[in-house]
Amino acid sequence: MNARMNSNIDDRREKTMKYAATGWILWRPDPSLVKQESYEIDRLLEAAPEHAYQVEVVNPDDVQLLVNSEKEDGIFVNGDKVKLPDFVIPRMGSTTNYFSLAVLRQLENLGVYCLNGSAAVELARDKLLHLQLLANAGLPVPKTILVQFPVNADFVETEMGFPVVVKTLVGTQGSGVYLCENRENLVDMLQFVEANNPSAQLILQQFLSESRGRDVRVVSIGGHIVAAMERIAKSGFKSNYSQGGEARPFEYGHRNELSVAEVMRILDMDIAGLDFLYDEEVGFRICEVNSSPGFEGLEATCGVDVPAFIYEYLDVKFRISRKAKARLLGQIPG
């Protein structure tokens, strides 16, 4: 990936340019993904210098933590003590584990601004937990059941009916999502899972026929909608852009914009991708929230510049004025 290999910063410009702040993108490749999110990483690296930020990619697996009571940073990369960044953008996605969360917490404890914080990343990673919080706040979500083996098929049929969606608790880009059309399909599938992986963590989710093969993806930064698109499956019921689905811009109403802001507030997120399903009763139900959303499809479909929104949001957080930014970029005399 050229942008990552070259750090995406022109050497000559780096020598003369001053930066508003420095940042890390916490990222590791995920072999289980249909498509690696190299696009998003490259875009964040490419756009950083244009906004007077210096950003590099750090794999959390390369980080060593030193927890002590001394006033020392306690962060090492590949065994070397490093200067702390001013901010961190976590992009671990489904590869998030205890260690990467510990790295994020350590950075937070040392005063590094994290976009999002460890609590928000952990919440988003658990599909059931964030739906529980949203449901408790009165926001519309699909009916959801946590799987216990053996599965009570009578209960599922009574409370949800069929078809029913089966999901792993952790997964992105449509991976780990299956549709069981009837009771027999569900029983056969879950018996197979129980026999091969009895500790598997699964949820069952209400299937909304109005949303078969389509949903709405919204990307929000700071509680405001950057853009929204309707995703449409080419075949089957999964509408993910990364799996070859089509997309078109979607106009989001004021009422729905308020619900997005409420989701962001409840989950304490700075940036998120929110997936909404169509429902004839309430209009939309919140299906899932992602703390490190892909935005290749959104940029291509809606013509927005997502990294620009992210860095402008950081401008506000770090109280960097437009005049100060222009000086840093050499647009006006220093």
Regions found by a protein language model. Name each.
Residues 16-45, 82-83, 105-111, 115, ...:
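Active-site nucleotide/adenylate-binding loops and adjacent lid/helix of ATP-dependent enzymes
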Residues 94, 290-302:
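Glycine-rich phosphate/pyrophosphate-binding beta-alpha loops
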Residues 178-267:
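Phosphate-binding site of ATP-dependent enzymes
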Residues 192, 237-286, 308-334:
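A long amphipathic alpha-helix within ATP-dependent nucleotide-binding catalytic cores
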